[in-house]
């Protein structure tokens, strides 16, 4: 499906080499200050064009078509479109019948019987423009509650930061070309990406996300837990293969006496749970890690088959990220913002007191 969310519904549209990509955000309350400069800044962070990303250069100028009047949301659907200006579709002519390894070509074709071979269509990282735009709008609502979502890269290939989570440097990441959270590893990360690119290959990456200013009570029990919603959102990003919350995999190696977050004087003494207990936020920082596979589009010679079953050897053309996880850090923040904004709105009717307060009743 192309729609995400329960109370705040986000729908993306468009293909990598189509006319445009964009989104519709439905359910945003009226009266939220709309920050168009922030929206554009988020899209600019996601843009390619550097030696650490795809050479494809797009202006990515957002056009807000509806849902905003005199600087504030109206409560009606917000439509945002970004036109594609620099697609080189001819680079993909030789792929019309070919299934690229590790891409969605094979599965899209056998599911739908038709696929857009130009840059991968909907399965392209280009679709993430819409996610970042939607996440920026969600952030405008979260600001009203002082909830802040930040992401950065803590691992590239075999190079992984050994800093403690509280030591990650988000201020440094804001200035880093690759959103690196560990200043001592930035050069290693960059070299790993460039080495992969120069050898006609690609490399994976690990992204850390922290949410501060969290409220208690976001998320539902059982099947709509906050952690399951976050995992759903992050796993829906192209190239993501794993998500951890709190201690994540490490929790399976621990004793309960170490993993439990004790309380004293009304405060948690640790945050192994990553800010979520029983599927509901406990007010501590949300801690998430998202793992991206290497970009499947590489320039080394590969083997595959075409839709007729013929064995083929081929070399790709086009413009591709040597490490899709770098720009993926911006997308991770966007998806987390969409989840939290949705949960925030759902929580307004979680109990009778909340509902009465919405109508000024006691």
Curated annotation (Swiss-Prot):
GO CC annotations on file: cytosol
Residues bound to NADP(+) are 46
Q: Which reaction does it catalyse?
A: 5-O-(1-carboxyvinyl)-3-phosphoshikimate = chorismate + phosphate
Q: What class of enzyme is it?
A: lyase
Q: Which UniProt keywords apply?
A: Amino-acid biosynthesis, Aromatic amino acid biosynthesis, FAD, Flavoprotein, FMN, Lyase, NADP
The record's EC number reads 4.2.3.5
Q: Which domain of life is it from?
A: Bacteria
Instruction: Give a yes or no for keyword Amino-acid biosynthesis in this entry.
Output: yes
How is the co-factor bound, per the entry?
Reduced FMN (FMNH(2)).
Q: Where does FMN bind?
A: 122-124, 238-239, 278, 293-297, 319
Q: Which GO MF term does the entry hold, naming one?
A: chorismate synthase activity
Could you say which cofactors this protein requires? FMNH2
Q: Which InterPro entries match?
A: Chorismate_synth, Chorismate_synth_AroC_sf, Chorismate_synthase_CS
**Gene Ontology process terms (BP):** amino acid biosynthetic process; aromatic amino acid family biosynthetic process; chorismate biosynthetic process
Query: What is any Pfam family matched here?
Result: Chorismate_synt
Metabolic or biological pathway: Metabolic intermediate biosynthesis; chorismate biosynthesis; chorismate from D-erythrose 4-phosphate and phosphoenolpyruvate: step 7/7
Q: Which NCBIfam families does this entry report, sorted A to Z?
A: aroC, PRK05382.1
What task does this protein carry out?
This reaction introduces a second double bond into the aromatic ring system.
Q: How does it assemble?
A: Homotetramer.
State the similarity comment. Belongs to the chorismate synthase family.
Q: Mind telling me which PANTHER family this protein's record contains?
A: CHORISMATE SYNTHASE
- Descriptive protein name: Chorismate synthase
Species lineage: Bacteria, Pseudomonadati, Campylobacterota, Epsilonproteobacteria, Campylobacterales
**Gene that specifies this protein:** aroC
């Amino acid at each position: 499906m192309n729609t995400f969310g329960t109370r705040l519904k986000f729908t993306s549209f468009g293909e990598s080499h189509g006319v445009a990509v964009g989104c519709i955000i439905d359910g945003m309350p009226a009266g939220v200050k709309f920050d168009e400069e922030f929206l554009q800044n988020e899209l600019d962070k996601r843009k390619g064009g550097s030696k650490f990303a795809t050479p494809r250069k797009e202006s990515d100028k957002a056009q807000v078509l509806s849902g905003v009047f005199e600087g504030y949301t109206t409560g009606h659907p917000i439509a945002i479109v970004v036109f594609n200006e620099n697609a080189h579709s001819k680079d993909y002519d030789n792929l019309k019948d070919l299934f690229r390894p590790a891409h969605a070509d094979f599965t899209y074709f056998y599911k739908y019987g038709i696929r857009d071979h130009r840059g991968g269509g909907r399965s392209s990282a280009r679709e993430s423009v819409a996610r970042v735009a939607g996440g920026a709008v969600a952030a405008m609502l979260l600001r009203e509650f002082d909830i802040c979502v930040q992401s950065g890269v803590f691992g590239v290939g075999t190079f992984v930061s050994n800093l403690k989570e509280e030591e990650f440097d988000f201020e440094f990441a804001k200035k880093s070309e690759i959103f690196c959270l560990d200043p001592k590893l930035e050069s290693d990360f960059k070299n790993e990406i460039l080495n992969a690119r120069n050898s006609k290959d690609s490399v994976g990456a690990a992204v850390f996300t922290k949410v501060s200013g969290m409220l208690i009570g976001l998320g539902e029990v059982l099947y709509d837990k906050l952690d399951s919603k976050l995992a759903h959102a992050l796993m829906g990003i192209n190239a993501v293969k794993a998500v951890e919350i709190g201690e994540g995999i490490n929790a399976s190696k621990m004793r309960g006496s170490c993993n439990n977050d004790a309380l004293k004087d009304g405060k948690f003494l640790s945050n192994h749970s990553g800010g979520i207990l029983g599927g509901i936020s406990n007010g501590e920082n949300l801690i998430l890690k998202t793992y991206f596979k290497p970009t499947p589009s590489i320039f080394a010679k590969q083997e595959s088959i075409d839709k007729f079953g013929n064995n083929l050897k081929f070399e790709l053309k086009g413009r591709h990220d040597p490490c899709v996880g770098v720009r993926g850090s911006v997308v991770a923040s966007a998806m987390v913002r969409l989840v939290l904004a949705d949960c925030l709105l759902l929580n307004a009717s979680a109990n009778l007191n909340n509902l009465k307060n919405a109508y000024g009743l006691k």
